[in-house]
Amino acid sequence: MYSMMMETDLHSPGGAQAPTNLSGPAGAGGGGGGGGGGGGGGGTKANQDRVKRPMNAFMVWSRGQRRKMAQENPKMHNSEISKRLGAEWKVMSEAEKRPFIDEAKRLRALHMKEHPDYKYRPRRKTKTLLKKDKYSLAGGLLAAGAGGGGAAVAMGVGVGVGAAAVGQRLESPGGAAGGGYAHVNGWANGAYPGSVAAAAAAAAMMQEAQLAYGQHPGAGGAHPHAHPAHPHPHHPHAHPHNPQPMHRYDMGALQYSPISNSQGYMSASPSGYGGIPYGAAAAAAAAAGGAHQNSAVAAAAAAAAASSGALGALGSLVKSEPSGSPPAPAHSRAPCPGDLREMISMYLPAGEGGDPAAAAAAAAQSRLHSLPQHYQGAGAGVNGTVPLTHI
């Protein structure tokens, strides 16, 4: 506190004091302000273990002045008193400072006499450095996902993305001409020509979010299908007819896929999606394939059979789109991983699949309404039951 004032005393021309009195912070010794007796420390039992530094000329002068100013201004803070005392000491002449300088010399000589081996050791100031916790958005969502509210957080994000994707699909100029067909694992690898750039930007953003969700051990996202950048191990073939980025319905599936192991989609309770709006239902329907790809072996045949009620309630909530939407797949059963022709046929239009009657019937249905059917057929095929295609 008094370092500025001591520097002033150091630069005074009449100050013939030793550097010991003038260097270093004076607040560490001398009694600080109005107390403490002039000579060496160790006068009381409390101060016997630590010897204080001798006071300099400014401290000798300010000791009486501080007490006087504190009596005149009882509400004034000690720091304000020190500032005023320092300003007054600067404007004082050498003749006025001389008696205090001589007194400081005497005190220093007495201190050296009492403590010949004294060496100034500055007191260590322990400053606790506060570490700031820097959490990114993904880290915050991971922390929320570890607790009970992870499903609600991911569901809120997925509903917003799904609603935006549905609106963008209906408004895109090339929406009726694009060829987007559901993959057997829920990955749709097509994009509408009217908004390829928007879909690519959205896919890049969702890849980062999926990285955060997929790497969380509690969310079950360590599945090889959870990362959109990894190639599917069951489908190593290329798609020359579909060079566009991922389908925008994949955005909702990416958000819903990490929480499929929790009580989200396979809980056999249709009341979970009973009150959601049309955009949210569309996002939930688009997430059907994503929920299938991350569901573990723990989803037994009973859970698959019970989930048909939830799928039926979900399908009734979804409104049909205009008739210009792309045709739905002709069949919805899950093919064997080794059958390459069966897998390729999932990407071809329904008219080329060899079943024109089924293609004409499926063309009237909605893209969103066909996704629950595809999921039902795939889930039933995995569990060894009959595909429920009549819903």
UniProtKB/Swiss-Prot annotation:
Gly residues composition bias: residue spans: 26-44
Tissues where this protein is expressed: Mainly in the developing central nervous system. Expressed in developing urogenital ridge.
GO cellular component terms listed in the entry, alphabetical order: nucleoplasm; nucleus
Annotated segments matching region Disordered: 1-52, 214-249
Subcellular location per the Swiss-Prot or TrEMBL entry: Nucleus
InterPro entries linked: HMG_box_dom (IPR009071), HMG_box_dom_sf (IPR036910), SOX_fam (IPR022097), SRY-related_HMG-box_TF-like (IPR050140)
Keyword terms: Activator, DNA-binding, Nucleus, Transcription, Transcription regulation
Entry text on domains: The 9aaTAD motif is a transactivation domain present in a large number of yeast and animal transcription factors.
Protein name: Transcription factor SOX-1
